[in-house]
C-alpha cells in the first residue's frame, strides 16, 4: 500500500485540536463587511471548531493528521 498524500490546501487551512476536533477560519470575512454590526465581526474573528459533519470530510484530506 503506497503512502497517502495530504491535500496541500487542507493542511494550510485547518488545524487539529488536542482532542481531535478541527478548527478553521470563518468564511465571508474578506470584504463587504460594512453592513454587518461590530458584534458579528468580533465573534467571527479567529478560528472556530467545525461541525462534525464537515470535519469528517476534511479528515479524508488529512490522512495522517497535521
UniProtKB/Swiss-Prot annotation:
InterPro entries: Ribosomal_bL35, Ribosomal_bL35-like, Ribosomal_bL35_CS, Ribosomal_bL35_sf. GO terms for biological process: translation. GO terms for cellular component: cytosolic large ribosomal subunit. Keywords: Ribonucleoprotein, Ribosomal protein. GO terms for molecular function: structural constituent of ribosome. HAMAP family: Ribosomal_bL35. PANTHER family: 54S RIBOSOMAL PROTEIN BL35M, LARGE RIBOSOMAL SUBUNIT PROTEIN BL35M. Belongs to the bacterial ribosomal protein bL35 family. This is Large ribosomal subunit protein bL35. It comes from Caulobacter vibrioides (strain NA1000 / CB15N) (Caulobacter crescentus). The lineage of its organism: Bacteria, Pseudomonadati, Pseudomonadota, Alphaproteobacteria, Caulobacterales.
